[in-house]
Amino acid sequence: MKDYQYPLDLDWTTEEMVIVTNMWTAVEQANETGLPVDKFLTTYQQFKTVVKSIGEEKRLGREFENASGYSLYRTLQQAKKQGSGKLKLGDD
């Protein structure tokens, strides 16, 4: 895992920040070590309870990708396409 800050909104509650941080961690795991598709999609559903607008999701996703190199959008698309099993992007 690289050293960078997760994009967060300081107006969020602590609980909301934890939910969004869990999303960024799940994207990292999917790209580095892999994780179950259902766990990723559940984490995304929780993320959408905090980040409701697609515009905000895209903005945060871009900030995260610029910092980490991992794309929320591409990871989510792969999870939806795959549907089940272990989600693993990137090089083995």
Swiss-Prot record:
Coiled coil: none
Organism superkingdom: Bacteria
Cysteines paired by S-S bonds: none
Family: Belongs to the UPF0223 family.
HAMAP family from the UniProt entry: UPF0223 (MF_01041)
Protein name in UniProt: UPF0223 protein EF_2462
Species name: Enterococcus faecalis (strain ATCC 700802 / V583)
Taxonomic placement: Bacteria, Bacillati, Bacillota, Bacilli, Lactobacillales
